[in-house]
Amino acid sequence: MNAKKHTPLSLHGLRLLFPPLATLGILFLTEWIARGSLTGETFTQYIFPHAEAYLLAWAMLFLSWLAVDWLTRFAPLATLLAAVLGCAPAAVNFYTLQLRGEPFLPWDLMQVSEAAGVAAAAGIHIQTSMVVSIVIIVLLVVVSFFLYRGRQKLNWKPRVAGFLASAAATCGLLFGVFLQPAVTQAIGIVPDAWMQDRYYRYYGVITSFLTNLTNLEISKPEGYSEEAVNEILDDTEAAQKYSSAPLYPGSYGATTSADETVKKPTIIYVMDESYWDVSELEQYGFQFDTDVSANLHALQQTSASGRAYSPSFGGGTCDVEFEALTGYSASFLPNGSKPYQQHVTKPMFSLPNYLKLTQGYQTAAVHCFWARYWSRDTAYPNLGFDTFLSLEQMTHVNKVRRHYWTSGLVTDDSMADQIIQQYEKMKTSSDAPVFLHAVTMQNHTNYNKDNYPDDVRVKVTEHPAGLKASTIGALEDFATGIRDADAMLGKLTQYFSQVDEPVILVFWGDHYNPIDSNYDVFTSSGYASDSSADPRLHQTTLLMWSNYTDKPVDLGTIAAYDISPVMMNLYGLEQPLYFQLLNRQLQVADRANTRGTVMNLDGTTTQTPSSLQESWSQKHWLLQYDLMFGKGYALSWMGMESLNSTQTDE
């Protein structure tokens, strides 16, 4: 008799405990899936120090469970939906990190099906964490079925009331906390403009994803109007009439009269994945068994060279590419947003469009990965590319690094062949000058010594004390990619030095990456700090070579958004007024103004721009807004009125 009295009470207690405990378990499964592992270090370094973020994520799962349960009175469904709410984005996040080095972001929802296809084609397989999580979720669903079986039935009024209360609490949490930056920052969730991967590691998948929803809105710059645009461009045009020192006094453009400069050369852009001159580490206690940058060092003696200040670290390739092709700064866009996916959704001003519409160029892009990756298949036409050769169309290419990338990555050597073949095809089909832009993939993160056989891999022969074997192996993997990129550079310059027409080749790296899972390569040697915001880790190697001038020019460091303006200035090409403005900014205000870091004209950096630098930054943003989102008033100044029909002021 007593047993019968205690059983309902115990059952009631279990029913009360199940929702919070089950959703807490689901939260841990979510993080396990997203990270690929869940160790003691995960808790001590990430979860416990940022417990408030995980408490918010748990509350979202718990309230969602309650809302579904009140509505359906079927606990297994509530348990299953809560699990899907947490674990499905976590799985997508895991694969997204593997593919592009960045986590699952809200705007990725626009191409979920495409991402799934890319993941399948890339040879990515289900992980142990996912299999175990599925088993645990099934067990939770089964337990909830038996635990809540025979529960007292309720009529519709209390069920609706319970659902509305739970739904209201869920909405309050979403709109009153997650989508309120002032609130989330007050409780310790700090935006990370540099590295979304780190943001997700600190605050977890659910909290990071939901707080990123605030990054979807573009605000019109203060004072935006046709008069403001005209005033800036009128001043820019007038400034060209004043005699002043050239941007680069020893350059071909500065030392050759305007009547004698080459007018419409072939222009080749190569953005090489994760490229920077790793031989720089030989000044910091490292030694390699081969000269990994022999061609680069030779070409620097007869070319313009320097560094490109990248807006990205550890990922975000498309941000760098976007800046280089347009002169637009990704820093003006919401933190974490991806321009190709969100903003390059209509034809707009860019270097390819300018060359095509005003100079009669034919344009093509070559990328040895899937066309839909970063939405390049839709962004490239809007930037003015007539042709896009992607991995789907490539034949007879070699692939390497299959230990991590099971389907392999196309080699830089094969990419050189693809570039040459595409160039020859364009020259055969038309007499129009050529602009060809290429993006490589061979040296994509992650790095592991097993990606190359021992007889191929570059060896580290000396290094600072204390580095792990895995870190040395990762550095060898990375250095092998740099050696092969250097060989590609040599192959391209050798070929284009022999063609019977003027050619410009611009070669640069998109961003630095962590080598292994940390910054030990940089910190152990004193090369850089362990902060991804360190300016040293944003200055990738940049080379501008041509087959019709051998004047060496020290470019210093320039922003990635200045690559095209500087290229045109360097070789005396006709520049659009927007690029003239950026070159003036580079000459009188700053070398770069990126993600909160300003590089002064003397190469020093600051997080506190001067009033002059602020003024130039405001001009830059106002024109960028006009060309990307506004009425396109500036287009008529540059002979690109045909794009104006696509402009709408948001």
Protein language model regions, located:
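Membrane-interface segments at or immediately adjacent to transmembrane helices
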Residues: G176-Y269
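Short alpha-helical interface patches
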Residues: R100, L109-G117, S129-V132, T207-I218, ...
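Alpha-helix initiation and N-capping motif
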Residues: L109-V112, Y202-I206, E226, S293, ...
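Solvent-exposed soluble domains appended to multi-pass membrane proteins
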Residues: L247-E260, Y269-D272, W276-E650
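Transmembrane and membrane-interface helices of multi-pass
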Residues: N2-Y200
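Intrinsic-disorder-associated interaction segments
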Residues: T7-S10, Y199-Y202, S225, T471, ...
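Ser/Thr-centered flexible coil motifs
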Residues: L105, Q127, N155, S225, ...
